[in-house]
Amino acid sequence: MKYILFIAFILSVVSCAKHDGYTLTGLVPEAWEGKPVFLVLDDTNQPHFIDSTKISGGKFKFQGKFEVPRYCTINIYLDPNDRQTRSKIINFSLFIDSTAVEATCNYSGKHPVFQISGSGTQTEYQNYLSEIQPMEDDRSKT
C-alpha cells in the first residue's frame, strides 16, 4: 500500500511541473526500415492512436505535449498490410512525460526487448514493479 501511495505522490509532483513537451526516439533494427510506427494512448478506457510515423535509418521519433505523464503503447507493424497477426506486430508500453525519452531495441534473443531511458515516471514505475515482484512471486507459489 505504501508503494502505491509513493507512486501517486511522485505522479502528482511530476504533474505539477511545467511541461514543455516530450520527444520519444526509438532505435530499432535497420531491417525494419519503412515500417509504420503508431503511438497509442493506453491509459483510458478506449485506447486510441494519437500519432504515427515511419522508421527511417533505424530510428523513429514522436514529439508532442501531454499535460500529465501518460501510459502509452508503441506498435510497429512489420507487415503494414496485416495488422491482425500478432507475430507481425512489435509493441511495448511506457510512460511518457515531458522529457526526452529513448527506447532502444535489443533483438539479440527470440523476441525484441526495449530498454527505456529518460522518463522519470517510467523509472519510478520500473522501481515499483521491482519492489512488488517478490510479492508477485510469493502469490504465484500459492
Residue ranges and their predicted role:
Residues Y3-V13:
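Sec-dependent N-terminal signal peptides
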Residues C16-T142:
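A non-transmembrane, solvent-exposed segment enriched in polar/low-complexity residues
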